[in-house]
Amino acid sequence: TPSLEKMEELSKFISTFGYIIKGDKEEVHPKALQGIIEKIKGKKEEGAISTIMLRSLKQAKYSPECSGHFGLAAKFYCHFTSPIRRYPDLQIHRIIKESLNNKISGKRQEQLTTIVDYASVQSSEKERKAELAERDVHDFYKALYMKDKVGQEFEGVVSSVTSFGIFVELDNTIEGLIRLANMNDDYYIYDESSYSVLGERTKKSYKIGDLVKIKVESVNVDFKEIDFEIVEKIEE
Protein backbone atom coordinates (compact mmCIF):
# COMPACT_ATOMS: atom_id res chain seq x y z
CA THR A 1 0.00 0.00 0.00
CA PRO A 2 1.38 3.47 -0.86
CA SER A 3 2.48 5.63 2.07
CA LEU A 4 0.21 8.39 3.37
CA GLU A 5 2.83 11.01 2.45
CA LYS A 6 2.98 9.84 -1.17
CA MET A 7 -0.81 9.71 -1.45
CA GLU A 8 -1.13 13.24 -0.06
CA GLU A 9 1.45 14.48 -2.60
CA LEU A 10 -0.40 12.72 -5.42
CA SER A 11 -3.75 14.06 -4.21
CA LYS A 12 -2.41 17.62 -4.11
CA PHE A 13 -0.92 17.27 -7.59
CA ILE A 14 -4.01 15.87 -9.32
CA SER A 15 -6.25 18.41 -7.57
CA THR A 16 -4.65 21.09 -9.77
CA PHE A 17 -6.27 19.29 -12.71
CA GLY A 18 -9.63 18.99 -10.93
CA TYR A 19 -9.39 15.35 -9.78
CA ILE A 20 -9.75 13.86 -6.31
CA ILE A 21 -8.85 10.48 -4.83
CA LYS A 22 -11.91 8.96 -3.20
CA GLY A 23 -11.71 7.28 0.19
CA ASP A 24 -9.21 7.31 3.04
CA LYS A 25 -5.71 8.43 2.02
CA GLU A 26 -4.19 6.17 4.70
CA GLU A 27 -5.81 3.05 3.22
CA VAL A 28 -6.33 4.01 -0.41
CA HIS A 29 -7.98 1.28 -2.51
CA PRO A 30 -6.54 0.35 -5.93
CA LYS A 31 -9.96 1.01 -7.47
CA ALA A 32 -9.69 4.66 -6.40
CA LEU A 33 -6.51 5.06 -8.46
CA GLN A 34 -7.99 3.02 -11.29
CA GLY A 35 -10.88 5.47 -11.37
CA ILE A 36 -8.45 8.36 -11.86
CA ILE A 37 -6.67 6.48 -14.67
CA GLU A 38 -9.96 5.96 -16.49
CA LYS A 39 -10.91 9.65 -16.15
CA ILE A 40 -7.61 10.95 -17.55
CA LYS A 41 -7.44 8.53 -20.48
CA GLY A 42 -6.87 10.42 -23.72
CA LYS A 43 -6.55 13.81 -21.99
CA LYS A 44 -3.47 16.03 -22.16
CA GLU A 45 -2.76 15.56 -18.44
CA GLU A 46 -2.73 11.75 -18.75
CA GLY A 47 1.05 11.48 -19.08
CA ALA A 48 1.82 13.77 -16.15
CA ILE A 49 -0.65 12.19 -13.73
CA SER A 50 0.28 8.63 -14.75
CA THR A 51 3.96 9.40 -14.13
CA ILE A 52 3.40 10.85 -10.66
CA MET A 53 0.98 8.07 -9.75
CA LEU A 54 3.52 5.40 -10.69
CA ARG A 55 6.20 7.12 -8.60
CA SER A 56 3.88 7.22 -5.60
CA LEU A 57 3.73 3.42 -5.42
CA LYS A 58 6.20 1.48 -3.31
CA GLN A 59 8.81 -0.61 -5.06
CA ALA A 60 7.80 -4.27 -4.95
CA LYS A 61 9.84 -6.68 -2.88
CA TYR A 62 9.67 -10.36 -2.01
CA SER A 63 8.47 -11.25 1.47
CA PRO A 64 7.53 -14.41 3.39
CA GLU A 65 4.53 -12.52 4.77
CA CYS A 66 1.18 -12.73 2.99
CA SER A 67 0.58 -9.01 2.51
CA GLY A 68 -1.50 -9.23 -0.66
CA HIS A 69 -1.00 -7.37 -3.94
CA PHE A 70 -1.97 -3.70 -4.09
CA GLY A 71 -2.09 -3.40 -7.87
CA LEU A 72 -4.34 -6.44 -8.24
CA ALA A 73 -6.41 -5.51 -5.16
CA ALA A 74 -5.79 -9.09 -3.98
CA LYS A 75 -5.82 -9.85 -0.25
CA PHE A 76 -3.98 -13.13 -0.84
CA TYR A 77 -1.18 -13.30 -3.39
CA CYS A 78 1.77 -15.57 -4.08
CA HIS A 79 4.54 -15.02 -6.62
CA PHE A 80 4.08 -18.33 -8.43
CA THR A 81 5.10 -17.89 -12.05
CA SER A 82 6.19 -15.32 -14.60
CA PRO A 83 7.24 -15.14 -18.27
CA ILE A 84 10.80 -15.74 -17.09
CA ARG A 85 11.26 -18.15 -14.18
CA ARG A 86 12.59 -16.33 -11.15
CA TYR A 87 14.10 -17.99 -8.10
CA PRO A 88 11.08 -17.14 -5.88
CA ASP A 89 8.85 -18.97 -8.40
CA LEU A 90 11.01 -22.09 -8.20
CA GLN A 91 11.10 -21.96 -4.41
CA ILE A 92 7.29 -21.88 -4.27
CA HIS A 93 7.08 -24.74 -6.78
CA ARG A 94 9.31 -26.89 -4.55
CA ILE A 95 7.24 -26.16 -1.45
CA ILE A 96 3.99 -27.00 -3.26
CA LYS A 97 5.44 -30.31 -4.52
CA GLU A 98 6.53 -31.25 -1.00
CA SER A 99 3.13 -30.29 0.37
CA LEU A 100 1.26 -32.34 -2.25
CA ASN A 101 3.41 -35.34 -1.39
CA ASN A 102 2.74 -34.84 2.35
CA LYS A 103 6.45 -34.50 3.07
CA ILE A 104 6.40 -31.33 5.18
CA SER A 105 6.95 -32.27 8.81
CA GLY A 106 7.14 -29.85 11.71
CA LYS A 107 10.92 -29.80 11.48
CA ARG A 108 10.79 -29.31 7.72
CA GLN A 109 8.35 -26.43 8.23
CA GLU A 110 10.95 -24.67 10.38
CA GLN A 111 13.62 -25.28 7.73
CA LEU A 112 11.42 -23.89 4.98
CA THR A 113 10.64 -20.80 7.06
CA THR A 114 14.37 -20.07 7.34
CA ILE A 115 14.92 -20.77 3.63
CA VAL A 116 12.04 -18.54 2.52
CA ASP A 117 13.14 -15.69 4.82
CA TYR A 118 16.64 -15.75 3.32
CA ALA A 119 15.43 -16.25 -0.26
CA SER A 120 13.06 -13.26 0.02
CA VAL A 121 15.78 -10.86 1.13
CA GLN A 122 18.39 -12.19 -1.30
CA SER A 123 16.00 -12.20 -4.28
CA SER A 124 14.88 -8.63 -3.58
CA GLU A 125 18.48 -7.41 -3.31
CA LYS A 126 19.62 -9.24 -6.45
CA GLU A 127 16.63 -7.97 -8.42
CA ARG A 128 17.47 -4.36 -7.49
CA LYS A 129 21.09 -4.90 -8.58
CA ALA A 130 19.96 -6.46 -11.86
CA GLU A 131 17.64 -3.51 -12.53
CA LEU A 132 20.46 -1.02 -11.86
CA ALA A 133 22.83 -2.92 -14.15
CA GLU A 134 20.18 -3.03 -16.88
CA ARG A 135 19.53 0.71 -16.54
CA ASP A 136 23.27 1.40 -16.68
CA VAL A 137 23.63 -0.51 -19.95
CA HIS A 138 20.58 1.21 -21.46
CA ASP A 139 21.93 4.65 -20.48
CA PHE A 140 25.30 3.85 -22.06
CA TYR A 141 23.83 2.82 -25.40
CA LYS A 142 21.39 5.73 -25.42
CA ALA A 143 24.30 8.14 -24.96
CA LEU A 144 26.25 6.31 -27.66
CA TYR A 145 23.29 6.60 -30.03
CA MET A 146 22.92 10.35 -29.40
CA LYS A 147 26.65 11.11 -29.69
CA ASP A 148 26.46 12.14 -33.36
CA LYS A 149 23.20 14.06 -32.93
CA VAL A 150 24.60 17.06 -31.04
CA GLY A 151 23.02 20.20 -32.49
CA GLN A 152 19.95 18.41 -33.83
CA GLU A 153 16.43 19.35 -32.68
CA PHE A 154 13.72 16.98 -31.46
CA GLU A 155 10.30 17.17 -29.86
CA GLY A 156 9.73 15.53 -26.49
CA VAL A 157 7.75 15.48 -23.28
CA VAL A 158 8.84 16.77 -19.87
CA SER A 159 9.19 13.54 -17.89
CA SER A 160 10.54 14.90 -14.60
CA VAL A 161 11.28 18.23 -12.93
CA THR A 162 13.82 18.64 -10.13
CA SER A 163 15.51 21.47 -8.28
CA PHE A 164 18.44 21.33 -10.71
CA GLY A 165 16.79 20.71 -14.05
CA ILE A 166 14.12 19.46 -16.41
CA PHE A 167 14.23 15.95 -17.86
CA VAL A 168 12.75 15.54 -21.34
CA GLU A 169 11.92 12.18 -22.93
CA LEU A 170 11.95 11.92 -26.72
CA ASP A 171 9.67 9.68 -28.79
CA ASN A 172 12.46 7.10 -28.97
CA THR A 173 12.48 6.89 -25.09
CA ILE A 174 15.86 8.65 -24.83
CA GLU A 175 15.93 11.10 -21.93
CA GLY A 176 18.11 14.17 -21.52
CA LEU A 177 18.56 16.91 -18.94
CA ILE A 178 18.02 20.64 -19.36
CA ARG A 179 19.99 22.20 -16.51
CA LEU A 180 18.30 25.19 -14.87
CA ALA A 181 21.69 26.85 -14.49
CA ASN A 182 22.00 26.88 -18.29
CA MET A 183 18.56 28.42 -18.95
CA ASN A 184 19.62 32.00 -19.58
CA ASP A 185 16.26 33.55 -20.48
CA ASP A 186 15.20 33.75 -16.82
CA TYR A 187 15.87 32.56 -13.28
CA TYR A 188 13.68 29.50 -12.71
CA ILE A 189 12.29 28.55 -9.30
CA TYR A 190 11.41 24.93 -8.52
CA ASP A 191 7.99 24.18 -7.01
CA GLU A 192 8.07 20.72 -5.46
CA SER A 193 4.31 20.53 -4.87
CA SER A 194 3.42 20.97 -8.55
CA TYR A 195 6.54 19.32 -10.02
CA SER A 196 7.23 22.44 -12.05
CA VAL A 197 9.61 25.38 -12.47
CA LEU A 198 8.53 28.98 -12.89
CA GLY A 199 10.47 31.87 -14.41
CA GLU A 200 10.88 34.66 -11.86
CA ARG A 201 10.58 37.44 -14.46
CA THR A 202 8.76 35.97 -17.46
CA LYS A 203 6.47 33.66 -15.41
CA LYS A 204 7.16 31.01 -18.03
CA SER A 205 6.60 27.55 -16.55
CA TYR A 206 7.55 23.97 -17.34
CA LYS A 207 5.87 20.98 -15.73
CA ILE A 208 5.61 17.22 -16.20
CA GLY A 209 3.67 16.41 -19.36
CA ASP A 210 4.53 19.61 -21.24
CA LEU A 211 5.48 19.23 -24.91
CA VAL A 212 8.75 20.93 -25.80
CA LYS A 213 11.23 21.23 -28.64
CA ILE A 214 14.84 20.69 -27.59
CA LYS A 215 18.30 20.78 -29.11
CA VAL A 216 20.93 18.21 -28.16
CA GLU A 217 23.57 20.32 -26.42
CA SER A 218 26.18 17.74 -25.41
CA VAL A 219 26.70 14.01 -24.89
CA ASN A 220 29.19 12.33 -22.56
CA VAL A 221 29.24 8.60 -23.31
CA ASP A 222 31.67 7.75 -20.47
CA PHE A 223 29.38 9.31 -17.87
CA LYS A 224 26.21 8.26 -19.76
CA GLU A 225 24.96 11.87 -19.74
CA ILE A 226 22.84 13.60 -22.38
CA ASP A 227 22.26 17.35 -22.05
CA PHE A 228 19.52 19.22 -23.89
CA GLU A 229 18.76 22.90 -24.23
CA ILE A 230 15.23 24.22 -24.57
CA VAL A 231 14.23 25.63 -27.96
CA GLU A 232 10.59 26.31 -27.27
CA LYS A 233 7.55 25.11 -25.40
CA ILE A 234 4.96 23.64 -27.75
CA GLU A 235 1.52 24.98 -26.95
CA GLU A 236 -1.31 22.52 -27.60
Where are these regions (language model features)?
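Append "with occasional cross-activation on large, charged helical scaffolds in nucleic-acid assemblies
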Residues: T1-D171, L177-N184, Y188-Y195, D210, ...
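OB-fold/S1-family single-stranded nucleic acid-binding modules
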Residues: K204-E236
